[in-house]
UniProtKB/Swiss-Prot annotation:
UniProt-recorded name of the protein: Sulfite reductase [NADPH] flavoprotein alpha-component
Pathway(s) where this gene product acts: Sulfur metabolism; hydrogen sulfide biosynthesis; hydrogen sulfide from sulfite (NADPH route): step 1/1
EC identifiers of the protein: 1.8.1.2
Keyword annotations of the record: Amino-acid biosynthesis, Cysteine biosynthesis, Electron transport, FAD, Flavoprotein, FMN, NADP, Oxidoreductase, Transport
Species annotation: Yersinia pestis
Note on cofactor: Binds 1 FAD per subunit. Binds 1 FMN per subunit.
Chain ranges of the Flavodoxin-like domain: 64-202
Length: 606
């Protein structure tokens, strides 16, 4: 922990007054100082015989600004917990979504706490992109009167672990702000670190800011609020930690038999649960690992599966822990490092010195295949200590309750690959496609995403860019726009390898076009000709018309791959704005940032 003097702005004295006071009291003894304190107290409280003085107004309460930069909801939930802690400690707090934060006011912040997640290749959460760009621009102000703390959320299975948190921490310090606490970089299993950090933040702020004598103020929004079809706000009893047990009603392959992709349309019956969602939200899916994978791992380690282990204080057989509580299909560099030490495998130990090769190995080699390639004799507790907790997967919702009512639809790309001749599949996608039977129970919850919403005005034009399974939320958008009778124009850009095999929801899109609900559709089939064509090529081709729609107030939505597609699409948008808007590169970038701030450029990328 780093301890520093509070900024002078937190005191009810100006720097000049503070300097004069410090100079004056230097010549007094402790006894004289004690007498003076009573003398000043008497002046303030107008005791008999005290020298009258003008009443001094109490300084306004110092508010802690708490910024949540969340991608999948974890940062938001942690920020909400910290907000509650600060309020309980009688401190005033303003919790704000990074996408709603007026970042030009950051120079006025005195106490700033940032909870930041990282997405893709070290990029900030989508809602924090504009703030991140501003802080790293020439317009960023000096922050010498600001004290701050940063908690970074990330995943060690990615190369740029917690990079967004590191960026915010280093840039705030570079701009002159003072650290209240050292930055925390937390992995997927972040709860223990988060609880300790919350306690440290509260204690540190209590030492710097007097508790409010009146009720502390807050500015925030409900955590689990959902909007019903009638427009009222409800609080759902279901969450990531308390999911709804629903039933699978439809599981259908929507790619052709000769397609290189296996994409499934999934429909889940929510029954009379009352679970509500909006177009743009995601569905969280809890899953069980493949029993065959569990048996394979146990056999490789010469374990029976009935060995007792403890998971979060709950005792259970090892086989049950591997099936339902521990991650088996994702590896990380940290796991490789620990396993190399236990196995003493020379190949793995040598790999640790080559960071790029280590990252690639962890990404492409599931834990069970690492054990097969580098055998070791682990006991049950050692195995459990190596593996990460199972986490749910999020899927963009492909339906609107205005049409499907008590159902929720998702579009799932099934992950399939071979390693050393052995077929492997993704944890959740394999569960949904291969192991979960129709009418079977499935645990789900809604992850609300207020950063991917249809425009409030039904007359506003909408541009949707979603290749592959990125088309999912736009199916929900079109269902909603049709039910609402929205008069605004709709334009879809979709792409996949082959027209005949990979045109997801083809009949539905054709109907929308025929009935005039979908104004335009541009399709990119990357493998149907000698040269590859992607959605970004179609965007560039339609640049002039695209600019016309933007000038008419269109909202732009992008869904799909964050690492390649989304970056390429953004570059084309910048090029279109520069060319047709007669701007240079810097002006185009600022223009796109303004669209993002106005919620006219929204992305759901992963």
């Amino acid at each position: 922990m780093t301890t520093q003097a509070p900024p002078t702005s937190l005191l009810p004295l100006s720097p000049e007054q503070l300097a004069r006071l410090q100079a004056a009291v230097g010549e007094f003894s402790p006894t004289q100082m004690a007498w003076l304190s009573g003398y000043f107290w008497g002046m303030v409280n107008q005791q008999p015989g005290a020298v009258a003085s003008p009443a001094v107004a109490a300084p306004p309460p110092v508010t802690v600004t708490l910024i949540s930069a969340s991608q999948t909801g974890n940062a938001r939930r942690l920020a909400e917990q910290l907000r509650d802690d600060l309020l309980a400690a009688q401190l005033s707090v303003n919790l704000v979504n990074a996408g709603d934060y007026k970042f030009k006011q950051i120079a006025q912040e005195r106490l700033l706490v940032v909870v930041a997640s990282t997405q893709g290749e070290g990029e900030p959460a989508e809602e924090a992109v504009a703030l991140h760009k501003f802080l790293f621009s020439k317009k960023a102000p000096k922050l010498s009167e600001t004290a701050f703390a940063v908690f970074g959320l990330g995943d060690t299975s990615y190369e740029h672990f917690c990079q967004a948190g590191k960026d915010f921490d280093s840039k705030l310090a570079e701009l002159g702000a003072q650290r209240l606490l050292d930055r925390v970089d937390a992995d997927v299993e972040y709860q223990v670190q988060a609880q300790q950090w919350r306690q440290q933040v509260v204690a540190t702020l209590q030492a710097k800011v007097p508790a409010q004598s009146t009720a502390p103020t807050q500015s925030t929004t409900p955590a689990a609020a959902a909007i019903t079809s009638g427009g009222t706000t409800t609080v759902s009893p279901y969450s990531k930690t308390a999911p709804l047990t629903a039933q699978l009603s439809v599981q259908q392959k929507v790619t052709g038999r000769n397609s290189e992709k296996d994409v499934r349309h999934i429909e889940i019956d929510l029954g009379d649960s009352g679970l509500r969602y909006q177009p743009g939200d995601a569905l969280g899916v809890w899953f069980d690992n493949d029993p065959a994978l569990v048996e394979e791992l146990l056999a490789l380690l010469w374990l029976k599966g009935d060995e007792p282990v403890s998971i979060d204080g709950q005792n259970m057989p090892l086989a049950q822990a591997l099936l339902s509580h521990l991650e088996l299909t994702q590896n990380t560099t940290l796991i490789v490092d620990k396993y190399a030490a236990l196995s003493r495998d020379e190949t793995l130990i040598a790999l640790l010195a080559d960071k790029p090769a280590l990252q690639l190995y962890a990404k492409n080699t599931p834990f069970v295949d690492m054990v097969r390639q580098a055998p070791s004799d682990l006991n049950a507790d050692q195995l459990v200590g190596l593996l990460r907790p199972l986490t749910p997967r999020l899927y963009s919702i492909a339906s609107s309750q205005a049409e499907t009512e008590n159902e929720v639809h998702i579009t799932v790309g099934v992950v399939r690959y071979d390693i050393d001749g052995r077929a492997r599949s993704g944890g959740a996608s394999g569960y949904l496609a291969d192991r979960l039977e129709v009418d079977g129970d499935i645990r789900v919850f809604i992850e609300h995403n207020d950063n991917f919403r249809l425009p409030a005005n039904p007359e506003t034009p909408v541009i949707m860019i979603g290749p592959g399974t990125g088309i999912a939320p736009f199916r929900a958008f079109m269902q909603q726009r049709e039910v609402d009778g929205a008069s605004g124009k709709n334009w879809l850009f979709f792409g996949n390898p082959h027209f005949t095999e990979d045109f997801l929801y083809q009949v539905e899109w054709q109907r929308y076009v025929k009935e005039g609900v979908l104004t335009r559709i541009d399709l990119a089939w990357s493998r149907d000709q000698a040269h590859k064509i992607y959605v970004q090529d179609k965007l560039r081709e339609q640049g002039a018309e695209l600019w016309n729609w933007i000038q008419q107030g269109a909202h732009i939505y992008v869904c799909g791959d964050a690492n390649r597609m989304a970056k390429d699409v953004e570059q084309v948008l910048l090029d279109v704005v520069a060319l047709h808007g007669a701007m240079d590169a810097e002006q185009a970038d600022e223009y796109l940032s303004e669209l993002r701030q106005a919620r006219r450029y929204q992305r759901d990328v992963y």
